[in-house]
């Protein structure tokens, strides 16, 4: 699976860490897991950049994105066709390098 964002000058081992986030899953009914949070925070601490993961309703990570120190892009995520009035079923968990909780 592909990591989105500006990946220039990212060391190979960190790119692998980002790609490995796709192997994790989150149990239904949970927003995230300790392991996922720890891995995302470790990458954020090293790069001083936001990391975002997008999960479907089953807890499968469907997208990983790397942002800059202030923002991370929300790419278009492919999903099954649904009514135009239904929710996407995709949730986002992301980090803030500065610790600022405001979006």
Feature-to-residue mapping (PLM):
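Active-site-proximal loop/helix of nucleotide/amide-processing enzymes and allied scaffolds
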Residues: 1-23, 76-103
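Short, structured surface patches at the beginning of a domain
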Residues: 25-28, 53
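Short, basic/aromatic recognition patches
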Residues: 27-42
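A short catalytic or substrate-binding loop motif that flags glycine-/basic-rich loops and adjacent residues
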Residues: 44-48
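Short beta-strand scaffold segments in enzyme catalytic cores
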Residues: 50-57
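Short, charged/polar surface micro-motifs in flexible loops or helix N-caps
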Residues: 59-60, 98
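Structured interaction and signal-relay segments at domain junctions
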Residues: 62-77
């Amino acid at each position: 699976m592909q990591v989105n964002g500006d990946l220039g000058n990212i060391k190979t081992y960190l790119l692998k860490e980002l790609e490995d986030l796709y192997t994790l899953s989150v149990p239904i009914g949970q927003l995230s897991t300790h392991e996922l949070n720890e891995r995302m925070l470790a990458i954020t601490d090293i790069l001083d950049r936001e990391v975002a993961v997008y999960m479907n309703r089953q807890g499968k990570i469907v997208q990983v994105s790397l942002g800059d120190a202030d923002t991370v892009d929300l790419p278009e995520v492919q999903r099954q066709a649904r009514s135009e009035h239904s929710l996407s079923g995709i949730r986002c968990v992301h980090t803030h390098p500065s610790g600022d909780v405001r979006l």
